Structure formats: structure tokens, C-alpha cells
A protein has these predicted regions:
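Secreted/periplasmic proteins that engage bacterial cell-wall peptidoglycan
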Residues: 46-71, 77-82
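Non-catalytic cell-wall polysaccharide-engagement segments
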Residues: 2-36, 42-44, 62, 79-162
Length: 162
């Protein structure tokens, strides 16, 4: 009986240690992506914390996330944005770095059109030609998607001492 209990304890310890290593590896990858975001955003009007908040909302930092035609960390629509990806030489939208680069490029393009971060997020989420979204925004309505991301981005800025 003692031998069985000892084996069970050993298995549980090994499982917990393995789980801890997986969690540590996930944090390491997320740290790498966060550094990459910071680097790209140095030459951009886009706040890195905004990008991080978009990633949290879109994929929960899961680089393998797929929702229809939208893939990766920033859930880039691979049909709509294939030309942009090609122009940026980002050939694999499932690659986290390519996905981040294309996602930030989309945000930059939207920021050129709409200076308000809420509008940028609304159209990132719904698409450039969302007529209902345009009308709603013109009437002062901000989507819950945009509100949640803006709140999280502000929280991340506070955490980063900005």
C-alpha cells in the first residue's frame, strides 16, 4: 500500500513539475512577443499596450487560434489581408511574429483613417467597410469590444509605469 501511495505521489509531483515547465515556457514566449511588439511600435503611432490588449482579447495569446479565416495571435483575416502580408514579406500568418507585424500594420492603417483609438478598434474588429459601425461611431457609440480593449490597454500602461 505504501509503495502505491509513494508511486501516486511521485506521479503527481512529476505532473505538477511538467505543468510548471509548460507555464514557464508560455510566459517566456509571451515575453518574447511583447518585446517584439515594443520594437515594432517604436516606429509606429500604435501603443504597444494596445496591441497586447488586442491579442489578449482576440486569441488569449494563443498563436494557434483560428476563427474562420482569422488566424493567430491578432486574428488576422488571411483572405482579406493576404496582399498586405505579402507586401510585408509575412508569409505565414500562423507565425506569431508575422501575425503581429501584419496586425500592427492593420492598426496603423486604421489609425491613419481614424485618429480615435476607439474607432481604430471598432473597425479592426468589424472591418473597414462596416457601414453600421461607421454610423454608430458617427453617432458617438463605442462598441463593447473597443471599450474592453481600451480599458485593458490603460491598465497595461499603468502596470508598465507609463
Amino acid at each position: 500500500m505504501r509503495r502505491v501511495a509513494g508511486t501516486i505521489v511521485l506521479i503527481l509531483l512529476m505532473w505538477c513539475f511538467g505543468l510548471a515547465l509548460i507555464v514557464q515556457a508560455e510566459h517566456s514566449r509571451q515575453d518574447d512577443w511583447t518585446e517584439y511588439i515594443e520594437l515594432i511600435c517604436l516606429d509606429s503611432k500604435i501603443c504597444p499596450e494596445l496591441v497586447e490588449a488586442v491579442i489578449e482579447r482576440e486569441s488569449g495569446w494563443d498563436p494557434t487560434a483560428v476563427n474562420g479565416d482569422c488566424v493567430g495571435l491578432m486574428q488576422v483575416d488571411q483572405i482579406i489581408h493576404w496582399r498586405r502580408a505579402q507586401e510585408l514579406n509575412c508569409l505565414d500568418l500562423m507565425d506569431p511574429y508575422d501575425n503581429i507585424r501584419v496586425g500592427i500594420s492593420i492598426l496603423e492603417d486604421l489609425a491613419e483613417r481614424y485618429e480615435d483609438p476607439a474607432a481604430v478598434l471598432m473597425f479592426y474588429n468589424a472591418g473597414y467597410s462596416d457601414k453600421l459601425g461607421i454610423r454608430a461611431y458617427e453617432n458617438g457609440v463605442i462598441s463593447s469590444y473597443a471599450s474592453v480593449i481600451l480599458e485593458r490597454a490603460a491598465e497595461l500602461e499603468r502596470l508598465h509605469g507609463k
